[in-house]
Amino acid sequence: MANIMNKTLKTALLVCALLLAAACSRKPSFVSVSDGQFIRNGRPYTYIGTNFWYGPILASDGQGGDWHRLMQELDTLHALGIDNLRVLVGGDGPDGVFSRVEPTLQKAPGVYNDTLLVGLDRFLAELGRRDMQAVLFLNNSWEWSGGYGQYLEWATGEKTLIPLVDGYRPFMQQMRAFQTSREAQELFFNHLKTIVGRTNTVTGKAYKDEPAIFSWQIGNEPRCFSDDPEVRDGFIAWMTEAARLIKEIDPNHLVSTGNEGFKGCEDDMELVERVNAIPGIDYMTIHIWPFNWGWVRPDALREDLDAAMDRTSRYIL
């Protein structure tokens, strides 16, 4: 009888060990795309998301860090059913620049605030504990996190204009140069490789194996800011290179451009199609700015709401 029990126990332990080994060797459930649908765990997948650009700053032990606030906000969002957060990896350039978020992550080319890098790690770990995911964007066509302008400034030494000081039109004209500046683009690509190739110091997972990452986004609203064919070709070329690099380092996660759509492509549907036909781009993004685009009046928001919703529906379709 004892021998039978021992054999049964050994068999049970062996089965448990095999199941545990299989579970440990199984890759996390990354999201994929198929026939215009997100797929997770073999089933169509939908989510509710929001912007949460400052998450890694809150998660850090340095300037701007607030762990209690982060826990409260993540728990509140999770309870509301919001499980996908769009997050800035980190700002570029020195602190103290008007209209730029701070503290910044990349102080100079390849020089990082390590406290914020760990903050990003901790943030992703907390998302994972709640089965939430992040869309991580790496660059920015606008000034508020450095982005195009800071890379150009590092590459050329020319001071970046600030839209709220110098005007949006002069700023956008200056930003066209990023599309054809190989030096500025290389600085960004180096940053991309550093972040996408990182290993999480909290979970021990390489970012490419991190289930808390939903996708990489090349930038926040990347634009070419030009009708010039040469500039547009440069725009497509550097984003093609960025998508290739991300997929080369991390074949597990989705990649998107972060582009606004029609408005982000100089009101040119041909450019929209080119942007979203870039190899390695898994899904299209669209941003809606009814107020900024004049679809609603500041003193008549309620009256204009239905018309704005109609224009939004037509814009998406």
PLM feature segments, named:
Residues P28-V296, R302-I316:
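Active-site mouth of glycoside hydrolases
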Residues A2-L13:
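Bacterial N-terminal signal peptides that target proteins for export
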Residues C16-L19:
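Repetitive helical segments and hydrophobic/amphipathic motifs
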Residues A22-A23:
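C-terminal motif of bacterial Sec signal peptides marking the signal peptidase cleavage site
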